[in-house]
């Protein structure tokens, strides 16, 4: 037992962990003097920036402790007895689950939050010592094995994928043997359980939201439960909130979905610091100083999704370099939002408040007088309201605020 645990990297916390997780590519401000092609190529370094958040720390801690719990089950009498029971499964005989335990949890969050990157960063730190090897008896253990849930939720497909990924690390041939022997799904469960017990510490199944729409979703979750009981390993499933309604259908499914859940980032100090760090990586000829107004604009036009913020700043600079303006400002940011993020407009709607009503209501605009009382209807466009304001010599912003939610940002 101690031989296995001692080969695991020491758990990191505080500033040591933040320093290990953070990634800031090198940047020299003289790059802004280079030609356009050189700057456009260097601009992609923005995508390599990683600043750990509270989510990153929590995910690392959860994965490390789950791996530790799994490794603690790999020695002792119960582990030897479970190996014998798994052999019975392969031989299609009656068997018992010896290890068992509720060692599964979920990590769910909207796309673009950086949860997959946080998981990869955590795995990178946890597996710094590589494969764990023991001499008596000799065995090799993969600390973390990551697979993807098949789009059709095929139980056999996922079992074969686990074998294939294990072969890549162990240089074994479990996958080829399974194909040659044309083993059944039940036999595969016994085979994978035996391999997981002997060679896998933590199994991570990504894209688990596929179970919500696949007809084999419940069968796949049942297989993972059986794998936990027969191998004693910890299993982490990762996906979007689309999987939540599926796991809420029954208590036996809900028990398997306990874990970490994340939403869009809050408008707080971390978001401010994140935006300021990104603005340090400027590749346009002219430098732009970030303001509170720009940070607020970025939050509203990204919905608090980190990947969207990065895309906006990257594409804004790309547009500025290509069109020759050579300056990142609200004009280029707006152009990036309108032209490059079109598919996201249905999910990100800044400064718009939706109010449901069954009929069009007339709203009177106060603040100026005219020969005929002026009325503005909810279906009027912004352009028509501004045109009418110019004609009546009235305050356009004041008129718009009567109809829409308008926020004035000082830059």
Where are these regions (language model features)?
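The catalytic "switch" region of P-loop NTPases
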Residues: 192-197, 202, 212-213, 222-293
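Mid-core helix/loop region of P-loop NTP-binding domains shared across ATPases and GTPases
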Residues: 72, 76-90, 96-100, 154-161, ...
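The feature captures the helix immediately C-terminal to the Walker
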Residues: 120-124, 310
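C-terminal alpha-helical "lid" subdomain
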Residues: 2-31, 36, 43-46, 50, ...
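Conserved catalytic segments around the Walker B and adjacent sensor/switch elements
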Residues: 131-150
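Walker A/P-loop-proximal flanking segment of P-loop NTPase domains
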Residues: 1-103
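Walker A/P-loop nucleotide-binding motif
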Residues: 95-120
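Post-Walker A helix-loop "phosphate-sensing" segment adjacent to the P-loop in P-loop NTPases
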Residues: 125-137, 168-169
């Amino acid at each position: 037992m101690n031989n296995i645990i001692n080969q695991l990297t020491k758990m990191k916390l505080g500033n040591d962990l933040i320093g290990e997780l953070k990634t800031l590519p090198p940047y020299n401000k003289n790059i802004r003097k280079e030609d356009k092609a050189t700057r456009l190529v260097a601009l992609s370094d923005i995508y390599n920036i990683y600043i750990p958040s509270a989510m990153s720390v929590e995910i690392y801690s959860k994965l490390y402790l789950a791996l530790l719990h799994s490794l603690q089950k790999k020695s002792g009498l119960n582990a030897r007895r479970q190996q014998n029971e798994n052999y019975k499964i392969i031989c299609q005989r009656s068997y018992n689950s010896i290890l068992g335990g509720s060692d599964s949890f979920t990590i769910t969050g909207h796309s673009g939050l950086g949860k997959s990157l946080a998981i990869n960063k955590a795995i990178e730190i946890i597996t710094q010592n590589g494969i764990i090897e023991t001499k008596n008896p000799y065995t090799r253990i993969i600390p973390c094995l990551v697979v993807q849930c098949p789009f059709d939720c095929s139980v056999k497909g996922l079992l074969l994928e686990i074998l294939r990924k294990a072969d890549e690390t162990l240089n074994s041939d479990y996958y080829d043997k399974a194909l040659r022997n044309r083993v059944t799904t039940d036999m595969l469960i016994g085979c994978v359980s035996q391999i997981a017990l002997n060679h896998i510490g933590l199994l991570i199944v990504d894209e688990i939201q596929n179970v919500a729409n696949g007809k084999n979703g419940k069968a796949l979750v049942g297989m993972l439960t059986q794998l936990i009981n027969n191998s004693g390993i910890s299993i982490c499933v990762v996906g979007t909130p689309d999987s939540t309604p599926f796991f809420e259908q029954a208590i036996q499914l809900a028990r398997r979905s306990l874990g970490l859940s994340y939403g869009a980032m809050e408008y707080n100090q971390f978001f401010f610091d994140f935006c300021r760090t990104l603005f340090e990586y400027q590749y346009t000829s002219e430098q732009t100083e970030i303001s509170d107004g720009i940070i607020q604009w970025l939050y509203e036009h990204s919905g608090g999704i980190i990947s969207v913020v990065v895309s906006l700043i990257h594409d804004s600079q790309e547009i500025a370099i290509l069109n020759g303006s050579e300056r990142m400002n609200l004009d280029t940011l707006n152009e990036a939002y309108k032209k490059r993020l079109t598919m996201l407009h249905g999910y990100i709607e800044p400064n718009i408040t939706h109010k449901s009503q069954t009929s069009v209501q007339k709203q009177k605009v106060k603040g100026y007088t005219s020969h005929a009382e002026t009325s503005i209807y909810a279906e009027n466009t912004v352009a028509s309201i501004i045109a009418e304001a110019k004609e009546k010599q009235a305050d356009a912003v004041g008129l718009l605020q009567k109809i829409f939610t308008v926020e004035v940002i000082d830059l």
